[in-house]
Amino acid sequence: MNDVWQSDWSMMAPEWIVLAAAIALLVMDLALPSDRSRRPLAWGAAAAAALAMIATAAMIPAGSASILHDTFRLDAFAKAFKFILLAGGALALLLVAEWAPKEGSPHRGEFVYMMLFALLGAMMMASSGDLLTLFVSLELLSVSSYILAGLRKTAPASNEAALKYVINGGIATAIMLFGMSYVFGLTGTTNLGGIARRLQETNEPYMLALAFLLLLIGVSFKLATVPFHMWAPDVYEGAPVPATAFFAVVSKTAGFALLLRLLVTIFAAAPSEGRDPSSLLLSMQPIITVLAGLTMIIGSVVALRQRSLKRLLAYSGIAHAGYLLAGFAAMSWAMIDSLWMYLLVYTLMNIGAFAIIAHIVNETGSDDLDGLAGLYRHRPFLAAALGLFLLSLAGIPGTAGFIAKLHIFIGLVVTEPGHYVLAAVMAITTVISYVYYFNLIVQLFFRPTFTAPLGRLPAGLSTAVVLCALGTLAIGWAPGLAYDMLAQFGHFGDFLP
């Protein structure tokens, strides 16, 4: 117990900031009259997330360390992923500030602090060094997300989204917990470093493989990869737009942090059946490759027929999860850099797109594709910004999305010849995605307007759009900025315990 109190709690400064802000805003929400706007609470939460991001950046020069008996790790991996999580959380909270559902907004206060609690869970996942802290952090993120999905309490679509999210999330949690129980049974410890060391001496390759598959299935539910993706379009469509944006970027980033922290740490050196390959993680690459290919194909093809903007971006997100999973299939130290860069770019272009969609939904009450028609004629800035985000999502040369995809593509073709097919699938599905992204661009610039002109973009959405556009342009035109940031993190050289 004395060791716990003597720990360096300043290592958790970003988490303390987010937790303190969430509790303070919860109390303020209870104290404010019910007819008082909760908009300032959202701005305060965004400021707290930005402050936590500054605290995280201030810790970058420090070396790797751990507290609480190695259950909480502050290494370069944790700092880098927290940076993305906090950036995505702050931008999503700006969308909450301007959320104006047609049912009214009596629950906006809950929206703000529940998003902060979800963000706290995601941050803890990135720093977890133990199965117990991983699981508790995952549940904090998951339960908060279920509430966010159902906050439009009088909207049937929101209630349906929350129910589907709870059911699928519960199944994923049960499967993952089952896999963790196998790992604990084989090693007798929950510490990730201890598990990795003891698994090198185990002679139960089949039990190990089963544990790996159970954990992979559980994480795949969270990432919405095929065939565990069916919940995502319905949840994205029914949830409030700011919550959808949060799920699309923060939850996905946290999921990949979990995938890397859990599976790579534990199974990178674990033995498999036979002598070649000797690593269980390497022996499972064919399965991961198939999942990645199917995810890219189904996400891209099904997106072609969508009329709802939120469902379209949901299937687009499934395809992007496939691109990221392809990087995981060709895992190397350089690929971890590529995955981090891809998630950073994905956060910027996705939040920017959702900010504009949030404005369209606020103004028209619908997220139908026709809401984009002729937007350039009366809101040229919005049309240009959304066009930029769509081009980047498509991976057009000269954009940040192209740089991010190129890194993963190169990683696939240089690791081993077996990944050439996966690289070809990535290239083909990227071309398929041009169809639905350019369909949206045609709507923006070349179709007549079917609805009344949109009002001016509110301050919160304007801030989010401008920041995302500047970030997307900066990385697209000067990718060295992202490389310099990766150099600050030491290219994750201290990732393994």
Curated annotation (Swiss-Prot):
GO terms for cellular component: plasma membrane. The chain crosses the membrane at residues 12-32, 40-60, 80-100, 116-136, 166-186, 208-228, 240-260, 284-304, 316-336, 341-361, 383-403, 430-450, 457-477. It is found in: Cell membrane. It comes from the Bacteria. Its main location: membrane. It is an enzyme of class 7 (translocase). GO terms for biological process: ATP synthesis coupled electron transport. Its EC number is 7.1.1.-. Keywords: Cell membrane, Membrane, NAD, Quinone, Translocase, Transmembrane, Transmembrane helix, Transport. It catalyses: a quinone + NADH + 5 H(+)(in) = a quinol + NAD(+) + 4 H(+)(out). The keyword Protease does not apply. It is a multi-pass membrane protein. Belongs to the complex I subunit 2 family. NCBIfam families: NDH_I_N, PRK05777.2-4. HAMAP family: NDH1_NuoN_1. NDH-1 shuttles electrons from NADH, via FMN and iron-sulfur (Fe-S) centers, to quinones in the respiratory chain. The immediate electron acceptor for the enzyme in this species is believed to be a menaquinone. Couples the redox reaction to proton translocation (for every two electrons transferred, four hydrogen ions are translocated across the cytoplasmic membrane), and thus conserves the redox energy in a proton gradient. This is NADH-quinone oxidoreductase subunit N. It comes from Geobacillus kaustophilus (strain HTA426).
